[in-house]
């Protein structure tokens, strides 16, 4: 992954590839753009849906309809995934660019966003029991054997479609059929926590940690969780360093 700015940088042009239109679910894009501007960068926003190959070059439109050649930027940051039906086509286009220019490169977006990949890798031992399937009966059978489970999409965001499931839920089949209607879903054994910790990593360095206090089974800020100030234990830092080595 590319580096982030820490001072006035020699990299002066960055484009944020994002979805135009609609109401944003958070202010991440605004915060990021403001910080790069403060560091002396020139900022452009490019619409996911506007990517086109013209005259042998990958291009995209800014909000004013001006078309930019993407390989002329010094840094590229993909913010959000855009429309699902065109995701793979857009990723194939972006993969032709120099990946060292990306803050979050294409391989990371494709292979590391989905949760099953982490479960099957070296970090799987640190996850709760997990079942992944596109077959509703496989997931339903696990729930009906007992225990408390969290059912969710394999690559969802913002706490959408996240459910607590036990064999006493009268609508357990309907929930699982809903989760699998478009493909794969996953069950994870529920782990009781009141404060979840999130660790921020950039450039292979741990740069911060914050907590999320939640009142139900969803710890996403978009679902009502509250960010809190927390400290990291030595054991947690050791685990984060293990994650960093795995990511590299």
Show where each model-derived region lies:
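Conserved N-proximal alpha/beta basic substrate-recognition cap immediately N-terminal to
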Residues: 20-132
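Ala/Thr-enriched low-complexity intrinsically disordered regions
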Residues: 6-7
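Short acidic/polar capping segments at secondary-structure boundaries
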Residues: 107-110, 134-138, 154-158, 168-170, ...
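Extreme N-terminal starter segment of soluble prokaryotic enzymes
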Residues: 11-15
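Rossmann-like NAD(P)H-binding beta-loop-alpha module
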Residues: 127-146
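Structural motif
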Residues: 75-77, 150, 186
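Phosphate-binding site of ATP-dependent enzymes
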Residues: 146-147, 158-247
